[in-house]
Each structure stands twice: as C-alpha cells, then as structure tokens.
Amino acid sequence: DVVTTGECRIVHKDFCDILLCTKAYFEEKEVGFYKKMQHTGYLRHLLVRRAVKTGEILLDLITTTQIGVEEEKELLAGWLERLLALPLEGKMAGILHTKNDSLADAVKDEGTEVLYGKDYFFEELLGLKFRISPFSFFQTNSLGAEVLYEKTREYVGETKGKVVFDLYSGTGTIAQILAPVAEKVVGVEIVK
C-alpha cells in the first residue's frame, strides 16, 4: 500500500519535501511501486532520517531488483540530481540505495550502495554524539528521548561507586548517559 501526504505536522518539512520530490520523479519515469501480493514492482520503501540537533539527513531508497542494471543506474542518477537540488533546511549527509527482494514487507538489507555522501549521520543527546546508520535502532524523537533519559537518570538515583546494567541496551544510549555518573556500566544486547 502506498501512503503519502504533502504535509505532516509530526515530522520536519524536509521529510515531506523529500517524499514529494521522490514520488513526482518516479511517477514521471513511470516506475511502479512494489505490489506485495503479486511480488512485482520496483519501489518498496523510502527511509528518511533527520537529526534534530545536527540537521543531518540520511535517505535510503529500498527497491527490488526487477529492472536492469543500466536502467537502474540512470534512474537513480536522475533521482539523486533532483534530491540534491531541493532547498532543504537540513544538510544531506547521505543518500543510499538498498536492494530487497524478500517476500516479507520488512526492510531487509540485501545489499546497500552509497549514492551520495556517507551511510550514517550524527545526532546528539544530552551532550553525547551518536553515529546512526539507516538500520540503527535509535529514538526517532531526540528531544523526547532527552526528557525520557533525564527521567531515567532520576529513577536510577545515586550511582557513584555502583555497577549499572543496561539490559536490552540497543545502541547503548541509556548506558552511555549513565556512564559518567557510575563506576561502571554494562550494556547487554543480543544481535542475531
């Protein structure tokens, strides 16, 4: 299913501008969306991440491999040109292309190519700087996360001379935020 909007109050305007530009470009080129019941089509997902504090933007276009290599190269070059011409408030850190022929509707990385810039961006939380890739588990609302983590510090209480365990630590944001005020912090995460 294709869900689109020209305006959304819960995301930065750059998200909508990128979405509308991408949608218009591929419609002009008559490139179809992926139809999961028929397993046909090219465009699967558009992942857009934007750092609140740094303003850096990372894009990842997830597609099938249902068009030829040369046609795809030309198609993506045109899309890249359009994106880089957009008057965004943020700074484009990277534009990626991920291939995914999986039958599942989830984004599965079956090969990612950097089309522009780098495959990560930086965000800051409570004075700490985090490097975030397209598939990193990281809070999408950085300002809300800061409030949440401040509350976590309050609940944890006095940590001087104590070892703190951050279970299900993900990228380790809570562990890193508690590290300066504890003797030792251990982050535990299972990655399969």
Give the location of each predicted region.
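Accessory RNA-recognition modules of RNA-modification enzymes
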Residues: 1-192
